[in-house]
From Swiss-Prot:
Gene name tied to this protein: rpl18a
Alphabetized Pfam families for the sequence: Ribosomal_L18A
GO biological process, one term: translation
Segments of skewed composition (Basic and acidic residues): 48-58
Matches recorded under NCBIfam families: PRK00773.1-1
Protein name per the record: Large ribosomal subunit protein eL20
Gene Ontology cellular-component annotations: ribonucleoprotein complex; ribosome
Domain of life: Archaea
Length: 58
């Protein structure tokens, strides 16, 4: 498992809220999926409301 740094933003009441998170995943696609599930569940947002800008290996 590698660690990936994911940056992006999600829609909130006041516009978009930026975020940067470190996740462990086997590849970049799984890191994106992990972000969609964690940010979506923590902030009650659907996938179209989450915009991932960059995924890079940490």
């Amino acid at each position: 498992m590698s660690t990936y740094t994911v940056t992006g933003q999600f829609q909130s009441r006041d516009g978009f809220q930026p975020f940067t998170k470190d996740v462990e995943a086997e590849n970049e696609d799984l890191a994106r999926e992990r972000i969609y599930t964690t940010v979506g569940s923590q902030h009650n947002r659907k996938r179209p409301q989450i915009e991932i800008k960059e995924v890079s290996a940490a």
